[in-house]
């Protein structure tokens, strides 16, 4: 069996990444597959956005399409609550720091970063919670069994370490020629191949089977290449 790494470029506020959440969960179940998360910082700095009518009218059609294509749930508290809360701000930096902190706070637990990302996405898209706020993120970490060490790790991952992480992710995107989020890429023997996930949205079992097959192969796959899957651009969903 070959050593294989699956790189996942994501953003916590990318709706299509939420649509691909079952694919990430399935990948984490594949024995022998090393899954690495790379937050891209889609809505950070000048791209942070306060919630308002413009943002709501922009994201809702995309969210409804995501729900239709992937089966992922969107809650009333998100559509009628968070998206109408003009005091809320969409900022990718804090939730990405929380994903990094989940890994840092419990290095021995494989998949904890992915679990944190999934919990953050559910909190946002189903429960309508403010995932850019530190107390909310610490509460989500506590739900996953992370204690005081998570708060310390969260603070340690913020600021310059987080900016460095975003820069590393952007360099990887450039290397892959990735147009946006989500992007999955397999690495074997230093060679990177972007996977076309479009046919697998809403089909996590088929995706898991593909990855298991890749672990047994010495070469590529007919799933490699072709960016057919819908994406969020680096600075927002399209």
What do these predicted ranges mean?
Residues 1-7:
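Extreme N-terminal starter segment of soluble prokaryotic enzymes
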Residues 21-28, 119-238:
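C-terminal cap of thioredoxin/glutaredoxin-like
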Residues 10-13:
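Short pre-active-site segment immediately N-terminal to redox-active cysteine/selenocysteine motifs
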Residues 6, 114-115, 196-197:
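Alpha-helical interaction segments
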């Amino acid at each position: 069996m070959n050593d294989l790494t699956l790189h996942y470029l994501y953003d916590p506020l990318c709706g299509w990444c939420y649509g691909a959440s079952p694919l990430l969960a399935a990948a984490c179940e594949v024995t022998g597959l090393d899954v690495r998360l790379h937050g891209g910082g889609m809505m950070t700095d000048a791209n942070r956005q306060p919630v308002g009518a413009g943002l709501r009218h922009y994201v809702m059609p995309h969210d409804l399409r995501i729900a239709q294509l992937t089966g992922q749930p969107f809650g009333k508290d998100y559509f009628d609550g968070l998206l109408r809360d003009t005091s809320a701000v969409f900022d990718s930096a804090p939730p990405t720091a929380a994903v990094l902190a989940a890994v840092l706070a419990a290095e021995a637990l494989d998949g904890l970063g992915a679990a944190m990302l999934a919990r953050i996405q559910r909190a946002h898209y189903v429960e309508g919670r403010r995932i850019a706020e530190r107390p909310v993120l610490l509460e989500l970490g506590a739900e996953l069994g992370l204690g005081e060490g998570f708060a310390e790790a969260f603070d340690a991952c913020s600021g310059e370490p987080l900016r460095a992480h975003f820069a590393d992710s952007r360099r990887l995107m450039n290397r892959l020629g990735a147009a946006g989020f989500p992007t999955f890429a397999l690495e074997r023997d230093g060679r990177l191949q972007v996977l076309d996930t479009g046919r697998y949205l809403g089909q996590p079992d088929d995706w898991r089977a593909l990855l298991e097959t890749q672990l047994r192969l010495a070469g590529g796959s007919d799933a490699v290449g072709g960016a057919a899957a819908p994406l969020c651009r680096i600075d927002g969903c399209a």
